[in-house]
A protein has these predicted regions:
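Short, small/polar-rich motifs associated with maturation and membrane association
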Residues: 1-168, 173-176, 180-182, 186, ...
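Conserved small-residue
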Residues: 40-109, 364, 371-379, 583, ...
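A subset of solvent-exposed loop/turn segments in beta-rich extracellular surface proteins, enriched
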Residues: 48, 53, 62, 66, ...
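Extracytoplasmic gating/loop element in the C-terminal half of outer-membrane beta-barrel translocons
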Residues: 106, 296-300, 304-310, 719-738
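Low-complexity intrinsically disordered tracts that form flexible linkers/tails across taxa
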Residues: 192-208, 619-627
């Protein structure tokens, strides 16, 4: 079962980790009785993009060739280093005398009709599926639940996938009336294959002209010259490129594999003392490979696959033979130790009063170790070997310099946290309940300044059962409950310190001295980010809860919000960011949920539920001069009195009646009004708010059909109110392949 806890009362128990809410996952347990077998299956279908989609308005090959011809007829001067394909490529070849006029005409006709479907070639409709098989049973002394699962998720980009095997064992044991134990063990093995970050298939499919062939008429891959980087002996710094060749000769593989126990003691009636411990260990291996036939390796080789690299400094060769293999191996170990006491007391003539006290301490630890390495000269298709013992190493001085450097890096991280928490609760019959929750956290990752001020997390909450008190005799109302809560949460960033943090480096062979660099600036004045939250709600149930509704409202105020500010280069590190308490953020919202069971028979049941919510926020902050114009255009600037994520655009004045081009208000005739204005004041005067990136309203519809032991679920989620900028009509022609 998955529960989402958002109010202050629920999140107070989870401390600083719960600043944005809590997701609680409860695994299944065994029940007394003979063995019961279960099977659960879920599926997901994802549709790939298509050129016929409304939001994909791209030229076909004939339109793109015509567009290139119009540019040429207008004597548009193409950049000399532009990738020449399509009409521009055919025309350039003709002008250079590399083809006749008839060949030029035939090439243009071919480009007009090729109409490459890049979305079909590079992406796919996907079907993902999840299977879980379980068995449970037991007697009064021992109960068990064992499950095994398999999950396969294919990515929209072809050749990408995630595959996972899982196993779970839950044992509940009763040794006596006062000694009980729960043991749980789980594990998973997963394998992933993603495209290299340099190969963005979706972006390539959207931004590449359909007049660019993917295959030659004989079915072989079509290559075109694409720009590279660095010094090169190739004309205009270009090497052959085919995205299918890059995908076929590269891989980004991830292999990972990832136990818990709890002892519960009940010494006296009404008092539970539980001690639990949990240990997890995960081991991951990531391998990134670039083959020697790829454009990526050609840039480092400074030559094509079949070419011998030019020797000497002029050759600028960083990889004479083979490909590149990058490996990262990491091990993460974590543990949790918890001691908890639960006490319940019933008193009164009819035991109508109930008092409950729960308290405990929790200790968490996490250790991570990793090693990364890069090796060149790797040949995957010849027995996973490396090319070594190069006799002519001096012919490639750049590669020799690279070999003399250390390309192995190690990482080691340790974190410890100790927490204490309590819950104090009182209830009278089933009429009303009052709760007081609290928690504190201390960690080696909070920074020493934050621990100087003790800021616990606490909340108070209550609920009143109106149905029992006021509408007890109204039969069609089965539940009517009013609830409310108020709480305070604190948050501190892990990597901030009042002291300057220096990263110690290795020996510099030039100066024969150990070197160091600035890792974090001192931040002695950073304060806790504090959130006060007030929640209220009303729950109504009709006809024995066949129909139920819930109304919720909340008001959340976060003070001393963390914000990143650019630090001037005079501080020693250009472009570095500094964390400050940048102001306050007010969030107000509501939610409405409805659930119903329209059909319920002995074997069949249909449940329907819907949820709708709205959120309205406003920033209260002073102007920060370190924002740039792009921050206002992208919506990353915080502006006083404006919702977070709001972005601005130049004021549109309409179309120019003489030539049809768009007109914008540039304040050219009122420049004097902008004198001595800050950037924020200038933006607010000359631009207009276009919207905000985050949705204002969101909701979902859910249907669940159950027939005997089979169930089928369908969910639809939506969001309203967010805005994004439109895609550009076309990419800059300078790229050549757009």
């Amino acid at each position: 079962r998955i529960d989402v806890l958002k109010d202050a009362s629920a999140t107070a128990l989870y401390g600083t980790r719960a600043a944005n809410g809590v997701i609680v996952i409860t695994t299944k347990k065994g029940a007394v009785g003979p063995a019961r077998f279960s099977y659960n299956h879920s599926s997901k279908y994802t549709r790939r993009p298509r050129y016929t989609d409304r939001n994909i308005n791209l030229m076909n090959s004939q339109q793109r060739v015509q567009f290139g011809k119009e540019l040429s007829d207008l004597h548009y001067q193409f950049p000399s280093d532009m990738t020449m394909v399509g009409y521009e490529g055919a025309l350039n070849s003709y002008y250079k005398g590399l083809s006749t006029y008839d060949e030029f005409v035939n090439s243009v006709k071919w480009y007009e009709t090729v109409n490459t479907d890049w979305f079909d070639i590079l992406t796919q409709d996907t079907y993902s599926h999840d299977h879980t098989f379980g068995v449970s049973g037991g007697n009064d002394d021992i109960r068990y639940y064992v499950s095994a699962g398999y999950n396969k998720e294919d990515g929209v980009s072809k050749t990408t996938y995630t595959e996972r095997y899982t196993a779970l064992v839950n044992l509940d044991m009763t040794f006596s009336k006062i000694v009980k134990a729960h043991f749980s063990m789980n594990g998973n093995v997963q394998k992933k294959n993603h495209l290299m970050s340099e190969i963005d298939a979706m972006d390539y499919a959207y931004n590449t002209t359909r007049a660019l062939p993917c295959f030659n008429p004989d079915g072989t891959l079509y290559y075109y010259d694409k720009s590279a980087y660095g010094r090169t002996n190739k004309p205009y710094n270009k090497f052959r490129y085919s995205i299918l060749n890059e995908i076929e000769n590269s891989s980004n593989e991830y292999d990972g594999s990832t136990i818990g126990a709890m002892l519960k003691v009940t010494p006296i009636t009404g008092l539970d003392i539980s001690v639990s411990g949990n240990y997890n260990r995960s081991n991951t291996l990531q391998e990134q490979w670039w083959g020697e036939k790829t454009h990526y390796v050609a840039r480092w080789k400074n030559g094509e696959y079949e070419e011998v690299p030019m020797p000497g400094e002029a050759g600028s060769c960083y990889l004479p033979y083979g490909g590149i293999l990058k490996t990262t191996n990491s091990i993460t170990e974590s543990y949790t130790f918890r001691t908890q006491v639960d006490y319940r007391l019933l008193f009164g003539e009819n035991q109508q009063h109930m008092f409950m006290l729960m308290g405990g301490f929790e200790l968490n630890g996490n250790t991570s170790r990793g090693i990364s390495d890069e090796n060149r000269g790797f040949v995957k298709d010849r027995g996973l070997q490396f090319i070594d013992n190069l006799q002519n190493l001096d012919d490639y001085p750049e590669y020799k310099k690279w070999l003399n450097k250390n390309h192995r890096s190690l990482s080691h991280g340790i974190s410890h946290q100790i927490s204490g928490y309590f819950v104090l609760s009182y209830s009278y019959r089933n009429h009303f309940t009052l709760n007081l929750n609290g928690r504190f956290d201390a960690s080696n990752k909070f920074g020493s300044r934050s621990n100087e001020r003790f800021l616990p997390v606490w909340s108070v909450s209550g609920s009143w059962n109106l149905q029992e008190n006021i509408l007890k005799n109204v039969e069609f109302i089965s539940e009517l409950r009013l609830r409310g809560s108020f709480g305070i949460q604190g948050n501190m960033l892990e990597d901030q310190s009042p002291n300057l943090i220096i990263k110690q480096g290795a020996l510099d062979p030039i100066y024969n001295e150990n070197v160091s660099s600035i890792a974090r600036y001192p931040n002695p004045n950073l304060r806790w980010e504090e959130t006060q939250q007030l929640d209220g709600g009303l729950e109504i149930g009709f006809f024995r809860s066949r129909l139920s509704m819930e109304f919720s409202v909340y008001s959340k105020k976060t003070s001393n919000c963390f914000t990143n500010v650019q630090v001037s280069s005079v501080n020693g590190v250009a472009g570095h960011t500094y964390v400050m308490n940048g102001g306050d953020l007010n969030n107000n919202g509501y939610s409405i949920s409805l659930s119903a069971t329209p059909v319920k028979t002995k074997d069949f049941q249909w449940k329907f539920s819907t949820y709708y919510s709205g959120n309205f926020n406003k920033v209260q902050t002073k102007s920060v001069e370190n924002y740039t114009l792009n921050d206002y255009l992208n919506g990353t600037a915080l502006i006083d009195g404006v919702a977070i994520g709001s972005f601005y655009s130049y004021k549109y004045l309409g179309l120019n009646p003489s030539n049809g081009t768009p007109l914008f208000d540039d304040y050219n005739d009122r420049k004097h009004l902008l004198e001595y204005k800050t950037l924020e004041e200038t933006v607010l005067m000359t631009m207009e708010k276009s919207g905000q990136r985050e949705p204002i309203f969101s909701g979902n519809f859910s249907n669940n059909f159950t027939y005997k032991n089979f169930s089928l679920s369908m969910n639809l989620s939506y969001s309203i109110g967010s805005k994004v900028r439109l895609f550009p009509l076309y990419s800059p022609v300078v790229s050549g392949v757009s």
